[in-house]
From Swiss-Prot:
This is Aspartate--ammonia ligase. It comes from Parabacteroides distasonis (strain ATCC 8503 / DSM 20701 / CIP 104284 / JCM 5825 / NCTC 11152). GO terms for biological process: L-asparagine biosynthetic process. NCBIfam families: asnA (TIGR00669). The keyword Amino-acid biosynthesis applies. It catalyses: L-aspartate + NH4(+) + ATP = L-asparagine + AMP + diphosphate + H(+). Pfam families: AsnA.
Length: 345
């Protein structure tokens, strides 16, 4: 069900022309910095993949992919991608990318089951990236180092925005705070996962929550994850579960946390088998992607996605993602948004 947050007294700081100029500058500058920080090269990404090969991202396991038949393939079905989490790992292998280097893409997706709102659209655009790593780097410290590099690019980009538009003052702290989802539960035991995210992000300004997908001491997950890309079940060197997480920042416009990135160290053979068993999805072992991983054809990697429209929305102090990207919205939402000062494209 769609929802709309209407910040009291909201007025956009930039007009439409300035907004479009800002989007272009942000996207160009950030992707150059991301590429430099992680040693990534750009590759061309697919908009759709064949159904039944295990390449598309299952997200939380309930979202339906947009599908269509292909006439010249005897009406075989193709799916619009949800993300490129598994496709990127296949590409690392096929392109023979060396350890310590990786790829990034401009990923465009359609998620038809999204609950539309200020932060959620049918249309998803993100930088999907993947980097080859060694088995010995499957540690929390390595995950944190990659997060810090990405966050450094985010901080630099915010200063670029300030130079362009002095009315938009930087708010990101210089350092990002790390916390495990179990520690977050213990800190706020009576809160929902979303309330916990808001509380910790408001306190620190920028947070990376480790361990997304594993069961916590209350028997629940902080949030769901598919079993076949992020490793959320391995017990790390610090004794806590999971080698992945979400990067969130505090958004003063909406007065709530905003997730900008989801990323993690990817499953190896052992973690994949364990997570397929936990999720009762053993049949996936027979799919193309999973067979290649289990046979040792795919490199160990770390990867994730960074929301382009959300990043621009945060930097340009917009209240609705529809002020950044063109999409379809309920007519009632458009009317309410306009009345509240949000001009949806």
């Amino acid at each position: 069900m769609s929802y709309l947050i209407k910040p009291a007294g909201y007025k956009a700081l930039l007009n439409l022309s300035q907004t479009e100029m800002g989007i272009k500058k942000i996207k160009d500058f950030f992707q150059q910095n991301l590429s430099s920080e992680l040693r990534l090269r750009r590759v061309t990404a697919p908009l759709f993949v064949l159904k039944g090969m295990g390449i598309n991202d299952d997200l939380n396991g309930t979202e339906r992919a947009v599908t269509f038949p292909i006439k010249d393939l005897n009406d075989s079905k193709a799916e619009i991608v949800h993300s490129l989490a598994k496709w990127k790992r296949l590409t690392l292998a096929d392109y023979h990318i060396e350890e310590g280097y990786g790829i990034y893409t401009d990923m465009n997706a359609i998620r038809s089951d999204e609950e539309l709102g200020n932060l959620h659209s049918l249309y998803v655009d993100q930088w999907d990236w993947e980097r080859v790593m060694s088995e010995s780097e499957r540690k929390i410290d390595f995950l944190k180092e990659i997060v810090r590099r990405i966050y450094a690019a985010m901080v630099r980009t915010e200063y670029l925005v300030y130079e362009m538009f002095p009315q938009i003052r930087p708010t990101l702290p210089q350092q990002i705070h790390f916390i495990h989802s179990e520690d977050l539960l213990q800190k706020y035991p009576t809160f929902t996962p979303k309330e916990r995210e808001d509380a910790i992000t408001k306190e620190y300004g920028a947070v990376f929550i480790i361990g997304i997908g594993c069961s916590l001491s209350n028997g629940e997950k902080h949030d769901g994850r598919a079993p076949d890309y992020d490793d959320w079940s391995t017990i790390a060197e610090n004794g806590q579960t999971g080698l992945n997480g979400d990067l969130l920042v505090w958004d003063d416009v909406l007065n709530r946390s905003m997730e900008l990135s989801s990323m993690g160290i990817r499953v190896n053979k052992e973690a994949l088998l364990r997570q397929l068993d936990i999720c009762k999805a053993g049949e996936k072992k027979e799919l193309y992607f999973h067979k290649r991983l289990l046979s040792g054809e795919l490199p160990q990697s770390i990867g994730g996605g960074i929301g382009q429209s959300r990043l621009c929305m945060f930097y340009l102090r917009k209240a609705h993602i529809g002020e950044i990207q063109a999409s379809i919205w309920p007519e009632e939402m458009r009317k309410e948004a306009r009345a509240a000062g949000m001009m949806l494209i």
